[in-house]
Amino acid sequence: MKVICGSVFLFSLFFQVVLGDYFSSSSGNPNLRTTKVYTVVSGTHLATAESTVSKTITTTKGLPTNAYYNCVPSKYIQSDIPMCAPNQGDRWVKGRKYKVSWDPLYFGVDNLLMVVSYLNDSGLIAATKKVQNSKGEIMLKANKGWLHDDSFQNVTIDLVTISENNMTLLTGPRILLAKDLDSATAAAENAAFYGPRRNIKAAIAVPSVILGLILVALVYYAYRKDTWKIYMAKIRIRRSAPGYGVRRSRRQRMQSRPVAYTSLPADAHFEDSDDEDYYQSQVKKFH
């Protein structure tokens, strides 16, 4: 009993240490975070209010106690940015989808506003999207409109919490948005992401040709097999026909000839005639 109680005590102590390490100060992050406050001016711009606020890190409302997330403090792109993707300096290409992930336990709201901001002094926003905080990640498609007819744009992926009339903005990773890539770079990235490119036409044509050759060989074999059977049957018919055979002995050939009389039958008799010539020609006339 003492051994069991001791094991239970050690297990509970280990459990408390692990949970305390994860949830205390969001695993190494400061309890207070100073950030700029932004106010919505229009649908396309943000104007800064030169002041700061302190934000206490809290857990998300309504999350189950056994919730599991892939984005944890040990995977943050920076210790002060509770996001795991994308990484700083990643390159995005228009028209493709990319993962954006964050730590839901860091924020104290049910919903977040994701903002794609241009990295310049204009304060122009490329896009905004409302997301559910508890999901922890979304797939974001790089829109060609974000480029504003340029080949490249530097943008940041920011997360915003809304409180009353103000927005608390957490500046996220910086990425390079590209219009397109050269063929060599695009092929290398596609191979790294999707695997080696396969020639679909060759993958279809080569097996088709091989199957066609096999089919022709089978048809030819079947034809030759039937022809050989017919030829052998003809040979057997010829061998079984009457007459001289190539493998019949002389004795067998002689036995197959019609029977010839070697002596006169008992009922045979001669006719007498005074004409000697006639007699000579009719010596053995049978009745």
UniProtKB/Swiss-Prot annotation:
Residue ranges of the TM segments: 202-222
InterPro entries found in the cross-reference section: Pma1
Listed Pfam families: Psg1
Cytoplasmic-side positions: 223-287
Record keywords, A-Z: Glycoprotein, Membrane, Signal, Transmembrane, Transmembrane helix
Subcellular location: Membrane
Membrane topology: Single-pass membrane protein
Signal peptide: 1-20
Name under which the protein is recorded: Uncharacterized membrane protein P31B10.04
Lineage start: Eukaryota, Fungi, Dikarya, Ascomycota, Taphrinomycotina
